[in-house]
Design a protein with these regions (language model features):
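Sequence signature of WD/YWTD-type beta-propeller architectures
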Residues: 1-175
């Protein structure tokens, strides 16, 4: 992970990782200013923006993450195993299930916890239909992933699911 100023200067490495650590879906933890990210499929972590100190929020299979505005809760989907949408307390790591998405979460890449290598793409090319390319097969078609988000007032969440065979947007109330 790196950060850089808007004008392109001041590039600095915040955290360097190898292919054995799958660091993904970095975003700001609401208004806290800290950075939250997943070490998929092992943990949800937060980095202090100023000191770079890293704390594990939860040893859990969080995948696509969406913090609330205050940075107190993190909405996430899950994969391998798919346990539906979860809300994780950023302070305690406690979680509660919102719903099951029944998304197919396609993509051979997600069956292991390291980045795709050239040989993965070469192998994927051997089994493609005329509608697919290696990126879809190795990394997984994005339209099959839930990618949850909060409503403006944070009383509902939206997510995608291809449970019917066609990707559609669903809304789940949190009340």
């Amino acid at each position: 992970m790196h950060r850089v100023r808007r004008d392109g200067t001041g590039l600095e490495c915040l955290y360097q990782h190898g292919n054995d650590e799958f660091i993904v879906h970095e975003t700001f933890l609401g208004s806290t200013g800290d950075l939250v990210f997943t070490v998929w499929p092992h943990a949800l972590r937060v980095m202090d923006w100023t000191t770079r100190a890293i704390r594990t929020i939860a040893k859990y299979n969080a995948w696509h993450i969406a913090p609330d505005r205050a940075g107190r809760r993190i909405l996430c989907d899950t994969n391998h195993p798919d346990e539906g949408l979860q809300i994780i307390d950023a302070g305690t790591g406690a979680r509660r299930q919102v719903c099951l998405t029944q998304s197919s979460n396609q993509g051979s890449q997600w069956r292991r916890s390291s980045y795709a290598l050239p040989e993965d793409f070469a192998q994927a090319r051997n089994t493609l239909s005329w509608m697919e390319n290696a990126v879809d097969t190795v990394y997984g078609p994005q339209h099959t992933h839930p990618h949850p988000s909060w409503s403006r007032d944070e009383s509902q969440v939206a997510f995608a699911s291809d449970r019917t065979g066609v990707t559609q947007v669903y809304i789940a109330s949190l009340s």
